[in-house]
Amino acid sequence: MTKSKKPIQPVSGTEVPRYAGPSTFARLPELRDVESCDVAIVGVPFDSGTSYRPGARFGPQSIRQASRHLRTNYHPNYDVEPFKVQQVADAGDITCNPFNIDEAIKQIEVGATDLLNKVGGIISLGGDHTIAVPLLRAANKKNNGPVSLVHFDAHLDTWDTYFGAPYPHGTPFRRAREENLFLDDASMHVGIRGPLYSRDDIKNDESFGFKIIHCDEFQTEGIDKIVERIKNRVGDNALYLSIDIDVLDPAFAPGTGTPEIAGMTTREMVNVLRGLSGLNLISADVVEVAPAYDHAEVTSLAAATIVYELTNLFAKS
């Protein structure tokens, strides 16, 4: 990625108190206020594909609000000042129809495609996981072909349909496979756990080419081995990261629609991401934050921190 020459910095907490100032992610400049942009952060406030507890439409703003907590100037784990070596900006939200899923998917695809024509990469704030389909379509256009998909989630999200509907949030990667949006020999799920509707869920998923790192393997193998497996799987391919916040244990992320116990810790999450430094990241999403079920902003803060980690990965890609 070609880095912008003179990035506009976020508002510093040493100059304006963190509870004040712009309401953009990490108090970054808005996209319209920068001449060029390497990474754009964009909200996708859509949750009409939710199968259980709704409310992820409020995720983007809650993540932005929680990002005020962050000190973002320098990240010692990457040894980088992410907002000095690249221009990162907040692109606002993609407007989408909450009453028509098909139309909303088209609107998200158009919005993300237009954005990727202007910037190097995007980090999307969900919204439910349905949004991954149009976002992957846009990433494919940017990449001129399918991408390596690494999907962090408690759930596979490869159902065929749910109550006959093709686009609820449990189906995006079935639809993506049907459209050849990801490389079936370079993609994987990470953090999968819990019971399934059928043993065929696993068989079907394997037929799509996914490799699975189950959540229990973090305890048996450790972070370094997990990172090695992911990097070996991705290789030099263009990478799309899709992160469902319910990959985290509800103790760390209660504010989500379909929580599953025995999940990853926030420490495990950020350490895995840090281990992926150097991969060819082109786009990412962080989805399923539903702040109505949160307390003390802990889920939104976890999501905001993950987004900040992703900006550092872009800086090192």
Predicted regions and their residues:
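Conserved alpha-helical scaffold segments that buttress catalytic/binding sites
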Residues: 2-317
